[in-house]
Amino acid sequence: MQHKLIAFIGGGNMAQAIILGLLKQGYPAEQIIVNDPNEEKRAFFANLDVATSENNVGSAIKAEVVLLAVKPQMMAEVCSPLSAVDFSDKLLISIAAGISTERLNALIPSVKSIVRVMPNTPALVGEGMAGLFAPKNTSENYRTFAQDLLGAVGRTVWVNDETQMHAVTAASGSSPAYFFLMLEAMQKALIKMNIDEKTARELVQQSMLGAAKMVTENPQIALSTLRENVTSKGGTTAAALAVFDAQHFNQTIEQAMQACLSRSQEMETLF
């Protein structure tokens, strides 16, 4: 991975995950600047020998890569002073949901290379899944850099059509919460079956981890086949799946993901 000076605007959880991933891979701490108004967050990064600042504009001027890690509703306010900076030879990366590259270009008119990223929280444990999009005028060099950057905390996929980022949000950006909800429901059900809370959690989390590993280690096997392999006719698994089917499980999942996609589309019009 090339070493470029990166200015992180915002030092929240996702920025922390990316920076820790970079440092773990040997990226030089002196090639990172973190800008955040929160003193505790700056102290956290200072303990990692990473430079910190409250001067977004000054850091953006110095850096070749500027990564916007702020909430969507803060984007316009954060970008307003940055619009005075010449971004023509810089890479702008945004990990904010619902902010299009067109909107970023309007906020910072001089920018020529933009990569929009939809990461997810498993990046905090190095198992993230990030969707990336870049307009055609973003250089191949900067595309590769952005991919390597997010690759420090998980896997990446590119989409060719920016509208697909809404589906990426539904598929990976928000989906950790779907899985947590499933685990939570299973744990609660086990507690009602007189299993203690700790044991219930261990049972469900290891089962999900094992199932996920079976999926990732057997990409040639269809998901439906993996499910069928666990399901004996007239058996216990079949009884459980029959209830899911009766409760329209697949349709509920699809409707939930569609609601997520629709909200992502709506957010593009708000910020």
From Swiss-Prot:
Function: Catalyzes the reduction of 1-pyrroline-5-carboxylate (PCA) to L-proline.
Keyword field contains DNA repair: no
Pathway: Amino-acid biosynthesis; L-proline biosynthesis; L-proline from L-glutamate 5-semialdehyde: step 1/1
Pfam families the record matches: F420_oxidored (PF03807), P5CR_dimer (PF14748)
UniProt record, GO biological process: L-proline biosynthetic process
GO molecular function, one term: pyrroline-5-carboxylate reductase activity
Name this polypeptide is given: Pyrroline-5-carboxylate reductase
Main location, first listed in the record: cytoplasm
Keyword NADP in annotation: yes
InterPro entries: 6-PGluconate_DH-like_C_sf (IPR008927), NAD(P)-bd_dom_sf (IPR036291), P5C_Rdtase_cat_N (IPR028939), P5CR-like_CS (IPR053790), P5CR_dimer (IPR029036), Pyrroline-COOH_reductase (IPR000304)
Any single GO CC term annotated in Swiss-Prot or TrEMBL for this entry: cytoplasm
EC number, UniProt record: 1.5.1.2
UniProt keyword list: Amino-acid biosynthesis, Cytoplasm, NADP, Oxidoreductase, Proline biosynthesis
Location in the cell: Cytoplasm
Catalytic reaction equation(s): L-proline + NADP(+) = (S)-1-pyrroline-5-carboxylate + NADPH + 2 H(+); L-proline + NAD(+) = (S)-1-pyrroline-5-carboxylate + NADH + 2 H(+)
Similarity section: Belongs to the pyrroline-5-carboxylate reductase family.
